[in-house]
Amino acid sequence: MFSKILTKVIGSRNDRTLRKLRKIVDQINKLEPQFESLQDEELKAKTIEFRARLEQGEDLDSLLPEAFATVREASKRLYGMRHFDVQMIGGMVLNDSQIAEMRTGEGKTLTATLPCYLNALTGKGVHVVTVNDYLAKRDAETNRELFEFLGMTVGVNVPNMPPQEKKQAYLCDILYGTNNEFGFDYLRDNMAFRAEDRVQRERYFAVVDEVDSILIDEARTPLIISGPAEDSSELYIRINTLIPQLVKQDEEDSEEYRGEGHYTLDEKGKQTHLTENGQEFVEQLLKDAGLMEEDDTLYSPANISLLHHINAALRAHVLFEKDVDYIVKDDEVIIVDEHTGRTMPGRRWSEGLHQAVEAKEGVKIQNENQTLASITFQNFFRLYDKLSGMTGTADTEAFEFQSIYGLDTVVIPTNRPMARNDMGDLVYMTEAEKFAAIIEDIKGCSERGQPVLVGTVSIEKSELLSNALKKAKIKHNVLNAKFHEQEADIVANAGTASAVTIATNMAGRGTDIVLGGSWQADVAKLSDPTEEQIQAVKAKWKEAHDAVLASGGLHIIGTERHESRRIDNQLRGRAGRQGDAGSSRFYLSMEDALMRIFASDRVSGMMKKLGMEEGEAIEHPWVTKAIENAQRKVEGRNFDIRKQLLEYDDVANDQRKVVYELRDELMNVDDISEMIGYNRQEVLEGLFGQYIPPQSLEEMWDVEGLTIRLRADFDLDLPLQEWLDNDDKLHEDNLREKIIEAAVQVYKEKEESVGESVLRNFEKAVMLQTLDGLWKEHLAAMDHLRQGIHLRGYAQKNPKQEYKRESFELFEGLLDTLKFDVVSILSKVRVQQQEDVERMEEQRRLQAEEAARRQQLQHQNAENQLDDGEGAEEAHSPMVREERKVGRNEPCPCGSGKKYKQCHGKI
């Protein structure tokens, strides 16, 4: 109560921020007449002046009013577009490393030019991050003329660019590209063969467009570069033939019949588990197929690989659906992004799932992959000195932006008041009734000339609706992952009279739907148009625009509620841009996934009480509230998953930093002999301690064992026993020093024989090659640790703490092995001349090129990645037998110490 009164008196944090920024906008507006009077050359010269002032010690904040005024004036002269005051506020919010929530159509692309120009003055480079290549290229071309007029260079970062072109792009003042490409470039740079092969420079300032999509929706899935492991295609095919024989266990089955099912299905967690009966049944199938010995069991260590294949095949058959989760095109399984509805060619699910889906669809099976490098978006974007973002819908996720990224959200007011009519949800009993009502709504809009945008959650649903519209003889366009090549053209015409457009999820996001269509698109169709022709096109568009406004503006139809309220708001936000008229309504049914899994009991209870008849819909605030509560549950669960992914990746991130910094140091220095010397001493002291324990009696010394190891591992043929026999005063410390001195002397002789520069180059090559190989193996070991760590919860241990402890032990092992292997190789190898070093460098280069050719870029399946830790409310691992159901008042198996009902039982 008190906080509400306080907010009314002094305003919310958002209001106070806007009041402060409006004062700076007033300063910028006062500069406008002065900048209008400048000649073009004088305006261009401002960039040189600002850079000089920065070098003399001024900071960006003091330059901001003049820099923003410069960009506004240049935009007016080149594009005839003047930045609104609210866009100036948005630009300042971005410059302050915050998130600007700006409604659709408020000009986010133009707003971004302000902080981009200001921060590019430093010469450190600005990255504008978009959700797809099309938007990166479009925005770069849109703003290129403006930036180049002001003396800035503009680049585009897209996949498959030649390395030299990519390197040049990163040297540009302002670089547009996708989140995936920036992340993969970072990983590739840290796998580079030579320092000059790297393309990125330091990460300074990033403006993330559609920041909610990139930093939240895609944050559950890490970026992974992987390479092919062993070929097991035949096994995938043979296992695939067995899976259709398995029967799902129905949760409603009584205890008497429950044992008859072979697996349980968890739609929420996208997981399957074999029951005890299923385990026995699968074992028999494998024995009959000759894949397992008669007296063997599925869970014996020798059959871990079989279990992995069974689990992957089962998930492929019962959880992953064609035209929803993936499409089959040109004999290839292509993943469909669940957030954007776009296909992701070249991306593959991990853990053998992709191969299992390929076996299921009967297409060519590609080799399983091994992780070579990996990072989450959270940890990648936190590498930037300054990070900011803009979107139409961020306020619902403001807490997550603040807690994960340290970014505050500021809601920017619209330039004109919002005029869209958001109508209440209509809920039907069946999907068929829902689609019939949608068709009727579309017919009505089409007859009165009102354009309609229909949002669906999957390709399958968009094609189902498309077929229904064809039967009703209603002309329409489909915008989904299968047809995104025509995306810009379809979106450009989506606002024309009577246009009906079906869009999967958020396909087409980032492109405004203009009422009456796009006059620019019509002008682009003309070859070398005259000014008269352009004016004629504009006049024709104005008539069409006014007619569409009179019909009610763009009407949005949602065919299902998404898991996140934010994505529903994004769909609604396509209508009512810049104060235009518009409307929106969601049509739901009790058969929708969200309703079925999360909201069915409460809502269906309401509908039964009301005595619903076929074709009748319910529209009530209670129903809308129940649906929003279901969405909040899912949002909370997804936040937990993302937070958990980050907590686990933070452990790996600390290790990644150490390895990448070491690698960076190795590539940038010419002489690592001092490092090799320290390592040699440490390794020999460690080996000495194994055979001659500290402060021990001579009877406990294993001199013979030490002699053998020194000869075998370090090519040191030392008469240790003879030394001891001939010198009574030779004790433990003296002997250790004598061995180290002998090793140093032998290495010095090697250096003299081959030459100092040859050996320095060889040391560096050996160190890098060994580090890369061990890091790859370490990543595989970390993956395996992650997959089984959640089982520690059953032993009353905290999985997260166990993961930290064991991963630290693994990493210590990696560093110890690195030192030992490098010292051993350098001691044993016979380097004759520079050609030997060059041969090794060439071999390493060829291996690197071959690995690069065979690399797969993955955005790993999130649920598959997160089979662990406290966030895993189910027993995800196939190695666990079906456990009894956890009581609501019992301790949660995750190891948090809370009761189950207060922890994962809430979800």
From Swiss-Prot:
Record's GO cellular component terms: cell envelope Sec protein transport complex; cytosol; plasma membrane
One matching Pfam family: P-loop_SecA
GO biological process, one term: protein import
Bias kind Basic residues: ranges: 898-907
Binding site for Zn(2+): C892, C894, C903, H904
Residues covered by region (Disordered): 834-907
InterPro entries in the cross-refs: Helicase_ATP-bd, Helicase_C-like, P-loop_NTPase, SEC_C_motif, SecA, SecA_CS, SecA_DEAD, SecA_motor_DEAD
Protein location: Cell inner membrane; Cytoplasm
The keyword NAD is assigned to this record: no
Superkingdom, taxonomy of origin: Bacteria
Cofactor: Zn(2+)
CDD domains membership: DEXDc_SecA, SF2_C_secA
Compositionally skewed regions (Basic and acidic residues) per UniProt: 836-853, 873-888
Membrane topology according to the record: Peripheral membrane protein
Positions contributing to ATP binding: Q87, G105, E106, G107, K108, T109, D512
Broad EC category: translocase
Protein EC: 7.4.2.8
Keywords: ATP-binding, Cell inner membrane, Cell membrane, Cytoplasm, Membrane, Metal-binding, Nucleotide-binding, Protein transport, Translocase, Translocation, Transport, Zinc
Cofactor binding mode and count: May bind 1 zinc ion per subunit.
Described purpose of this protein according to its UniProt entry: Part of the Sec protein translocase complex. Interacts with the SecYEG preprotein conducting channel. Has a central role in coupling the hydrolysis of ATP to the transfer of proteins into and across the cell membrane, serving both as a receptor for the preprotein-SecB complex and as an ATP-driven molecular motor driving the stepwise translocation of polypeptide chains across the membrane.
Stated name of the protein: Protein translocase subunit SecA
